[in-house]
Amino acid sequence: SGDGIDSTSQNFAKALMRSGLDIFTHRHYPSRIRGGHTYVEIRAAGHEVQSRGDGYNFLLALGDSFARNPKEEAVYGDEEIKPLSENLDELREGGVIVYDSGLLEDDDVAELNLEERAEENDWHVFPIDLRGMAKEHGREVMRNTAGVGVTAALLEMDLEHIEDLMTDAMSGDVLEANLSILRDAYEMAQEEYEFEHEVRAPTGEHDEEQVLVSGSNA
């Protein structure tokens, strides 16, 4: 919580919508004001989507899920692993997992029996140091943007709509830094990994203009 998950997921959902897809999102909130495991589900299809659906095909584990008070330098509960551990059960056979190896210790990942479960379910796992990439570009919070770049590459999406949304929301050095890490992460994934998974972004086309709104605003 507090790591930009909401804005990152909303922009990714809008990019899918602008590419011609129908979108349905669901936001899970932790039961406390600051900190705790939070996640967003995005369902996208080339036909009308009216519900969340069951399970998902792609898991991007971001953030550290800490409950913390920076002023007191206090941390309430070590929950780094939750973005990965608490969402595995709903990942479908043949699904894709991207997690930030720069945030998670090998021992924590090993306790999940991820390797064995991946083999049993034909999951395709990509441990990528998103945190390290973000630090190289000057701001650790941009690991989310790096994650989006990797995700877009693995789904064989074009970056055009994502870049347009960033340009609408940012400016100056912040925009340039985010565009840079987005493109670098995208190209890194294309160059360094073999795409043996079958999960790809669907294709679609809208007959009329679309808008993405929350249930409250609707």
Residue ranges and their predicted role:
Residues 2-218:
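Active-site cofactor/cluster-binding pocket
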